[in-house]
Amino acid sequence: MSSVVRSGRISVPALRARKGGTPIVALTAYTAPMAGHLDPHVDVLLVGDSLGMVIYGFETTLPVTLEMMIAHAAAVVRGSSRACVVVDLPWGTYRESPEQAYRNAARLLAETGAGAVKLEGGQEMAETIAFLTARGIPVCGHVGLMPQDTLMEGGYRATGRTEDSAARVLADAMAVAEAGAFMIVLEGTLEPVAAGMTRSVAVPIIGIGASPHCDGQVLVTDDMLGLYGSFQPRFVKRYAELALTVAEAAACYAEDVRTRRFPAMEHCYTLSR
């Protein structure tokens, strides 16, 4: 059964129209409670396949399944009412053919009520993006550093370090935009290259490890809140240290239980007088 999309959400055309205007604010969300906390403050809630690492403890995003993405995206839609919900198509669900991509994207949107899908890839994915958009599937592109290519690349490496690399990233973004993507995430790309791309490409460029001159920014929420491990990518600014708060709260709770300070009588049910 599909989720119901509530009225009042930021639309795909509204996001596309933000090119060169007030920067678009995006954060990841994987659960209904977090979506509810973030929704008043952001324009886009990205249900990223990063949930494989953040929620499930995988080393990469590659083990994430379509069923996982559907379950989490539906929760985010239920927990929010304002932001546009964009959902990653996971590895292995869209590169075989445009028809495979359409089948899985249509299922994802129908079963979750999300507003758009996101897929990784440049010039080689232009045909697929055009196929999807021609059939009513809004697509957000993703170029530059592409986490789903980690097997081919041997890890995570910033792009745009050479003239050839910079030209390739720009050509990828241009191809994705011309194919019909309404917005493009640009990840892990040298700042001058990212700034120039933002000026050159007709649709909003959302940076993550890119440039302050992009049309918007996205971060993994757990990174931004200091919840996800000790490793901090260079491009992350921590706005809180919630891992410490959680640890302190758990320690206080454990001490109260062991010393029988919790539960106190006010936490117990008693007969009314």
UniProtKB/Swiss-Prot annotation:
- Record: active site: 187 (proton acceptor)
Which superkingdom, per the lineage? Bacteria
Alphabetical UniProt keywords: Cytoplasm, Magnesium, Metal-binding, Pantothenate biosynthesis, Transferase
Residues noted as binding Mg(2+) in the record, renumbered to the chain: 49, 88, 120
The UniProt entry, under InterPro entries, shows:
Pantoate_hydroxy_MeTrfase, Pyrv/PenolPyrv_kinase-like_dom, Pyrv_kinase-like_dom_sf
Q: What is its EC number?
A: 2.1.2.11
Q: Name one GO molecular function term.
A: 3-methyl-2-oxobutanoate hydroxymethyltransferase activity
What is the name listed in the Swiss-Prot or TrEMBL entry for this protein? Answer: 3-methyl-2-oxobutanoate hydroxymethyltransferase
